[in-house]
Amino acid sequence: MMQSIGSYHHNNMSNHHHRDILNRKRFEIVECLNFQRTLLLNYLRSNHVFDEEDCELIMAEKANRARAGKFIDFLLMKGSEAYQHFLDVIQVENANLYESLTGDKATSRKFSVYF
């Protein structure tokens, strides 16, 4: 199925925008993510953003900050839809980080994240 030029341009701009945010806020994200809890990776797996191998490679890192850095590297390759799923779960798990990344106030819509 072919994308229209406008649709391609919008998707390309969205990809560039989320990549820019992830790169600019990388230090803050690395400091805030906690891979001791499994909600983030489980949610992204259930939404087919990450697969089992992605999660294993992230969790193979010894330190939490190394895991967070690897996570961002993987997320950068996944596209704007993956970034939106990331924001959905971060809104529940870390409201301050969500607000820093989006400029929007986090809501308590937990039901949208849980299966």
Language model regions located:
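Death-fold homotypic interaction modules
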Residues: 1-115
